[in-house]
């Protein structure tokens, strides 16, 4: 999972996961994201923001993120959906390939 938020709006859909190591569900969600990435490949940007990372405060403030949030962006970089973990790989694939 990539940490380069500059990829949002690069013409590909993006999903950003707010990973918090203090939440057990974060590891489960990361596993499901990796499963989805194996199926979808490079046609979607799978990105991660670590909760508590001060270098990402602007992003977290702009989108009012919380730990375990999943933010879905279209290819133009517009936020189109937000969910809270846990989403299974199948659900992620469905959301990202429609």
Place the predicted regions along the sequence by residue.
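Short active-site neighborhood of thiol/selenol oxidoreductases, capturing the structured segment around
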Residues: 9-22
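Stable alpha-helical elements in mature extracytoplasmic
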Residues: 4, 29-32, 88, 92-95
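Non-catalytic, surface beta->alpha helical segment in thiol-disulfide oxidoreductase systems
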Residues: 72-98
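Structural micro-motif
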Residues: 62-72
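Thiol-based oxidoreductase modules, predominantly thioredoxin-like and allied folds used
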Residues: 18, 41-56
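Second-shell loop/turn segments in exported
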Residues: 19-24, 79-82
